[in-house]
Amino acid sequence: MTKFKLEYIWLDGYTPVPNLRGKTQIKEFDEFPTLEQLPLWGFDGSSTMQAEGSSDCVLKPVAIYPDPARTNGALVMCEVMMPDGHAHASNARATILDDEDAWFGFEQEYFFYQNGRPLGFPEQGYPAPQPYYTGVGYSNVGDVAREIVEEHLDLCLAAGINHEGINAEVAKGQWEFQIFGKGSKKAADQIWMARYLLQRLTEKYGIDIEYHCKPLGDTDWNGSGMHCNFSTKYLREVGGKEYFEALMASSDKNLMDHIAVYGPDNDKRLTGKHETAPWNKFSYGVADRGASIRVPHSFIKNDYKGYLEDRRPNSQGDPYQIVRRF
């Protein structure tokens, strides 16, 4: 029997943005445990905005990954449950219509922050604009950011997370990683776990991750988004112009229902500037990064079949709520 370090990870009850929480227990197994072997666990919900008075909450394992940063470690994604077995009110994952044929690709943007400002920013004022997007060299990315993003990439791949790439973004200290998942819950689990690994990794560098969609306020710097590329089996295999137009009409009709779960303060980011569409107006266009929905050229050439990109979700959006809305 081998002792395994099981890191149980969950989302707390803070709003509008839940925080990642985690704690470790040691259990013995003959080999790396399966999801079915993992026990339920508890925590004090009064300390996470998830209970008052009778404060016991239950952690239900729903996904497991190897933890490459620990010997005999496992990362356990959990749903928060009530003691009677019902899903906690903060448990957005439990409300998802899980569809293994729904595919999601998330483009997670974020800032490295140190001493209250983006990594690489001067103590006063701002750096010169550009050429940071996909930049190379010390003057563009500094001396530590690339080390972190490369280590994060390796951690995700070693954990079995379908990490698909990295790049420096438009503002100094701003980066992006991409996660692709087949299945509504699987895709959302993996982006949350990738966020967890990034935040845990940067502890040793004395750096925080800032996910706010417009951390530099009303300035001429791009905000941070989490563009969501999505498709269903029908959209990939059948599609068609008539179906596409009906889908766009439905998206227009349900505009505010989508905006409500696409992350807080999106009105500060979705202004019609910096490659965004206004938050209160729906639009779509071929290869148009200033539209709500960007339609790839390949989609049109393939008889309106394939994937679409919703550019409205922001960097603080909850992937569980986003895939639920889709």
Curated annotation (Swiss-Prot):
Subunit structure: Homooctamer and homotetramer.
Protein name as it appears in the record: Glutamine synthetase
Binding site for L-glutamate: E275
Chief location bin: cytoplasm
Activity control, per UniProt: Transferase activity is inhibited by NH(4)Cl.
Induction comment: Up-regulated by the nitrogen regulatory protein NtrC.
Residues bound to ATP: E164
Catalytic activity entry: L-glutamate + NH4(+) + ATP = L-glutamine + ADP + phosphate + H(+)
Domain GS catalytic: 83-326
GO CC field: cytoplasm
Keyword Ligase: yes
Record InterPro entries: Gln_synt_N (IPR008147), Gln_synt_N_sf (IPR036651), Gln_synth/guanido_kin_cat_dom (IPR014746), Gln_synth_cat_dom (IPR008146), Gln_synth_gly_rich_site (IPR027303), Gln_synth_N_conserv_site (IPR027302), Glutamine_Synthetase (IPR050292)
Keyword Magnesium included in the entry's annotation: yes
Further facts: Two forms of glutamine synthetase (GSI and GSII) can be found in this nitrogen fixing bacteria, GSI is a typical prokaryotic glutamine synthetase whereas GSII is similar to the eukaryotic enzyme.
Subcellular location: Cytoplasm
EC number: 6.3.1.2
Listed cofactors: Mg(2+)
GO BP annotation list: glutamine biosynthetic process; nitrogen fixation
Function: Catalyzes the ATP-dependent biosynthesis of glutamine from glutamate and ammonia.
Species in which this protein is naturally found: Rhizobium leguminosarum bv. phaseoli
GS beta-grasp domain boundaries: 4-85
Residues noted as binding Mg(2+) in the record, renumbered to the chain: E107, E109, E169, E176
Key words, A-Z: ATP-binding, Cytoplasm, Ligase, Magnesium, Metal-binding, Nitrogen fixation, Nucleotide-binding
GO MF annotations, alphabetized: ATP binding; glutamine synthetase activity; metal ion binding
Similarity section: Belongs to the glutamine synthetase family.
